[in-house]
Amino acid sequence: MAPYSLLVTRLQKALGVRQYHVASALCQRAKVAMSHFEPSEYIRYDLLEKNINIVRKRLNRPLTLSEKIVYGHLDDPANQEIERGKTYLRLRPDRVAMQDATAQMAMLQFISSGLPKVAVPSTIHCDHLIEAQLGGEKDLRRAKDINQEVYNFLATAGAKYGVGFWRPGSGIIHQIILENYAYPGVLLIGTDSHTPNGGGLGGICIGVGGADAVDVMAGIPWELKCPKVIGVKLTGTLSGWTSPKDVILKVAGILTVKGGTGAIVEYHGPGVDSISCTGMATICNMGAEIGATTSVFPYNHRMKKYLSKTGRADIANLAEEFKDHLVPDPGCQYDQVIEINLNELKPHINGPFTPDLAHPVADVGTVAEKEGWPLDIRVGLIGSCTNSSYEDMGRSAAVAKQALAHGLKCKSQFTITPGSEQIRATIERDGYAQILRDVGGIVLANACGPCIGQWDRKDIKKGEKNTIVTSYNRNFTGRNDANPETHAFVTSPEIVTALAIAGTLKFNPETDFLTGKDGKKFKLEAPDADELPRSDFDPGQDTYQHPPKDSSGQRVDVSPTSQRLQLLEPFDKWDGKDLEDLQILIKVKGKCTTDHISAAGPWLKFRGHLDNISNNLLIGAINIENGKANSVRNAVTQEFGPVPDTARYYKKHGIRWVVIGDENYGEGSSREHAALEPRHLGGRAIITKSFARIHETNLKKQGLLPLTFADPSDYNKIHPVDKLTIQGLKDFAPGKPLNCIIKHPNGTQETILLNHTFNETQIEWFRAGSALNRMKELQQ
């Protein structure tokens, strides 16, 4: 623990000369800036090379690409214990990225730390708070008006603490990162679960909670459990209607939503070269849906081409020089290997209600009829951080153009979300946007929009059964439109476009015919489009705010009466005792994602106000006692009521509580609010069969106990009316289970074992009340 403590106590002095950023240490053979926006921050391939050589010599074996990049960023490569799936690594990420919904809490925590500046290059991206209603410009104007307080806070906090700020309308965080900040070999953390998008450019890009981002921005080594590595070998060539999206839809069907947990998915093999750089990004992006720590592709000519086209030929040239360190070693070993022949891969569509329910497009209509899913498609939606590249828009436009040539338009409503201002401006210039409008589409703002529930949908009523198809990444119940009866399917943008034209799930564009306006039948040809524009990208409007060199006079104000922002109060420390007689707030039945724990959509406006957003705590989770959402028994009054109200009652009356969950609890978004809220309302532990990686870490960061049943069947021993006592906290130690006494209302008791994954540093967080509390302790 000494190195951690030493670093924190020296932060105030060290940050003045930026000692903790990798770009400031040692000389280098070539000085190439990380980005155009940070000309004095350099890529350190020489340090990466040095660290890789140290680790390879220690381990005495070939390394995977994932290992090279991760171990190449070790804080102490000569002495760090390294064992896949077991040890915790202390890493030095190159940069941090935050989107506006998570940046609020991250920056509030950073302000609480008392530090003057961020220690690594960091950016804030305004993409989550723009609601889709009428179309791009109108929706953007409305969002700027409604969210002015939050945008002003983020802009001034960025200016004060040295964080770059991308204004609303600039685009989706992951597209901006790919266009400007990602590069081969980078280690980047982002406060969004789809940060792995950057793996399409050969980087290790990992989604985290805001508290993790605060550690990195503070210059503290970031902890990550040493990931296992799943190899996906690609052979053959993508062609026809089959797209990069189909690779990850197929992988999701194989590995399921938790099959990648604790692992990096590393794509390799001859088939890689048939996939564009942005296509590789699509595959890595949706790796979040299998629970993977991240996903990555090896550096190749496709990445070089993309870097050059986005104005970063100097980075491409430097990557060529260090190419041997940006690909896996021959003979490296994976923990698991999946092989996919791209020649045999068919277009896929996954859903509804879970992204791992995979179907070939040719079969989904038949399956839908059998299952009673609505066949008529109400809305087709393309775009999102997963599929909004120039190539995606071009392939969709190629499909739309064929329909227009035969006098057809979309039978379904159709929306288009450009991934960035650069993509929007370029597809406008090159005619793609107009083709998509002509076929019946509405171009939305450069933002997340309906993908995260920012959709003011008017065509149905809540509870109305319907089907939508999207090129998004997630299709959890109610995620896009807050309607639990919306059957959402995810597929490629070109398949979405074809299905929106046909209007039904029973249409297979590979084999089925459409009838043109003239009554003649025709078949859509497989789309073909340029992966990058033939001329340069059109950058569109300038939407970036540089942090000033001198920010000493910059104020960051938070009104005490604000309903959108709230300064944080420290959580209480552990009292040194076991947790006695914990009330069960809810025993959750089945899937419980972070959308169920802390809903997005209309709740996004409260992401900077912990008390207000806590009113959505677990409102989407199903209570096993009555099969209902947001209806739990108050153990004192015996009345059923909303989960947040019951939690507040317990907090007011000094009753500490626990949540019981099922498998893969907390899958999905990286939002740390799903951990902050239960802590704020008096929760002490979350006990489940298993956790999703990011959520488990977020819970630890906020001083909660994420615990798992040593015997998963013990889930069935606990009833919502029981009380639980957790023993062994005085001797809390890594690898040592805790005892849990189940106290039934009839006076009988049972004792079970609970496992945990805490290391010594994380146990310090628990004792201090949170990771932020511990940081402050070490500064004193």
Swiss-Prot record:
Catalytic activity: citrate = D-threo-isocitrate
Record's compositionally biased regions (Basic and acidic residues): 524-537
A cellular component annotation (GO) from this entry: mitochondrion
Segments forming a coiled coil: none
Modifications after synthesis and translation: Forms covalent cross-links mediated by transglutaminase TGM2, between a glutamine and the epsilon-amino group of a lysine residue, forming homopolymers and heteropolymers.
Cofactor: [4Fe-4S] cluster
GO molecular function: 3 iron, 4 sulfur cluster binding; 4 iron, 4 sulfur cluster binding; aconitate hydratase activity; iron ion binding
InterPro entries, alphabetized: Acnase/IPM_dHydase_lsu_aba_1/3 (IPR015931), Acoase/IPM_deHydtase_lsu_aba (IPR001030), Aconitase/3IPM_dehydase_swvl (IPR015928), Aconitase/IPM_isomerase (IPR050926), Aconitase_4Fe-4S_BS (IPR018136), Aconitase_4Fe-4S_dom (IPR036008), Aconitase_dom2 (IPR015932), Aconitase_mito-like (IPR006248)
Region feature (Disordered): 524-560
Modification sites for Phosphoserine: S559, S670
GO annotation terms (biological process): citrate metabolic process; isocitrate metabolic process; liver development; response to isolation stress; tricarboxylic acid cycle
Positions contributing to substrate binding: Q99, D192, S193, H194, R474, R479, R607, S670, R671
Pathway terms, separated by semicolons: Carbohydrate metabolism; tricarboxylic acid cycle; isocitrate from oxaloacetate: step 2/2
Top-level taxonomic group: Eukaryota
EC number(s) reported in the record: 4.2.1.3
Predominant localisation class: mitochondrion
Modified residues (N6-succinyllysine): 31, 50, 138, 144, 233, 411, 517, 523, 549, 573, 577, 591, 605, 628, 689, 723, 730
Compositionally biased region (Polar residues): 551-560
Localization of this protein: Mitochondrion
Annotated organelle transit peptide span: 1-27
Enzyme class name: lyase
Quaternary structure (record): Monomer.
Family of the protein in this entry: Belongs to the aconitase/IPM isomerase family.
Designated name of the protein: Aconitate hydratase, mitochondrial
Source organism per UniProt: Rattus norvegicus
Lineage: Eukaryota, Metazoa, Chordata, Craniata, Vertebrata
